[in-house]
């Protein structure tokens, strides 16, 4: 048995066997269909806009306010804290208060400022500046206060 008969027996299809019996030649067809490349279409994409920083005008106005206060009693501490929660800087003059109440207000405001992520600084005798996180304090004021003032307020 020749190799061509074995190949014919195992690999040819019944249609090919029948065509071989009648003397027809096998058609050579290319399995790959030739396709035209797809037409190029002009597609326009919107240009990427650079990211713009948008700041609300109301926020800019609130951050530029500084509130000056002279509380006389400890009960006014909550109103001062409300200004800080409203993102406004507050300067507090505690000279018209007793020392005990002034210390209590500073303690209360220190906790408030810590809770909102702000800052509190002494800017003069019995005068403090409290700021929320959106206000930066730059610089420092040296303490050149009189000795008698220092002895009256032991805690500051």
UniProtKB/Swiss-Prot annotation:
Signal peptide annotation: none
Places the protein is found: Cytoplasm
Disordered, as annotated region: 20-50
Presence of the UniProt keyword Protein biosynthesis in the record: no
Gene Ontology biological-process annotations: division septum assembly; FtsZ-dependent cytokinesis
Coiled-coil blocks: none
Highest taxon in the source lineage: Bacteria
InterPro entries on file: Cell_div_SepF, Cell_div_SepF/SepF-rel, SepF-like_sf
Comp. bias intervals (Basic and acidic residues): 20-36
Keyword Cell cycle in record: yes
Keywords, in A-Z order: Cell cycle, Cell division, Cytoplasm, Septation
Entry's Gene Ontology cellular component terms: cytoplasm
Pfam families in the record: SepF
Its job: Cell division protein that is part of the divisome complex and is recruited early to the Z-ring. Probably stimulates Z-ring formation, perhaps through the cross-linking of FtsZ protofilaments. Its function overlaps with FtsA.
Similarity remark: Belongs to the SepF family.
Designated name of the protein: Cell division protein SepF
Species name: Bacillus cereus (strain ATCC 14579 / DSM 31 / CCUG 7414 / JCM 2152 / NBRC 15305 / NCIMB 9373 / NCTC 2599 / NRRL B-3711)
Lineage: Bacteria, Bacillati, Bacillota, Bacilli, Bacillales
UniProt gene name: sepF
